[in-house]
Curated annotation (Swiss-Prot):
Residues 1-30 form a transit peptide. Has a role in germline cell development and proliferation which affects the frequency of apoptosis. Required for mitochondrial DNA replication and transcription and fertility. Disruption phenotype: Reduced mitochondrial replication, transcriptional hypoxia response, sterility, arrest of germline cell proliferation, reduced frequency of apoptosis in the germline. Severe mitochondrial DNA depletion in somatic cells but does not result in major anomalies in worms development. Hypersensitive to ethidium bromide. This is Single-stranded DNA-binding protein, mitochondrial. The keyword DNA-binding applies. It comes from the Eukaryota. GO terms for biological process: DNA replication; mitochondrial genome maintenance; positive regulation of mitochondrial DNA replication. It is found in: Mitochondrion; Mitochondrion matrix, Mitochondrion nucleoid. Interacts with nmad-1. PANTHER family: SINGLE-STRANDED DNA-BINDING PROTEIN, SINGLE-STRANDED DNA-BINDING PROTEIN, MITOCHONDRIAL. The keyword Oxidoreductase does not apply.
Length: 170
């Protein structure tokens, strides 16, 4: 037992020694410049292997206004609507703060066509999708255009229908 502990100790020391040597290495000036430089003209995107990443959004909320159903230039349908979410925060003085946020959602294809007939203002939905940004580019004067954030929906699940305007109707 004692012998195995000393063996583990030697291997641990060897590993720590190698790690400290690697940590002490300094990158060259050229490596630092390459790291922060804009992409070179000869950059081949196929050479780069991307690390694992996730762009996923899940929202549960209510539809703010009746959705807008349109057909794109490519002839395919899309649906645009806003979903409202609420968050509640307790402040230091004990009062509760209600934060309401509006999220722009876009749905494409057959799902847009189906949802245009089933959801309306007040419908409760669960939306799963990804974030998408547009705008933010510089114009000729060097001013940046407004950057907009959208959610491109992959799944939209109705949770509850909007309340009827006249509850006496069946």
């Amino acid at each position: 037992m004692l012998r195995s502990l000393s063996t583990i100790s030697k291997s641990t020391v060897r590993c720590m020694s190698l790690t400290s040597k690697m940590a002490a290495e300094q990158p060259s000036k050229q490596e630092v410049d390459d790291l922060f430089a804009e992409k070179p003209q000869h950059h081949n995107p196929e050479q780069r292997r991307h690390a694992y990443s996730v762009n996923k959004v899940e929202l549960v909320g209510g539809v703010a206004l009746d959705p807008l159903y349109k057909t794109g230039r490519n002839g395919k349908p899309y649906l645009i609507f806003n979903i409202i979410t609420n968050s509640y925060f307790k402040q230091q003085d004990g009062t509760t703060l209600d934060q309401t946020e509006r999220h722009a959602v876009s749905v494409f294809g057959k799902q847009a066509e189906i949802l245009s007939k089933t959801i309306k203002k007040g419908s409760r939905l669960m939306v799963q999708g990804r974030l998408h940004y547009s705008g933010g580019q510089k114009d000729e004067q060097g001013n940046r255009t407004q950057r907009n954030t959208y959610i491109i929906a992959q799944t939209v699940q109705p949770l509850a229908r909007a309340a009827r305007e006249n509850p006496d109707q069946h």
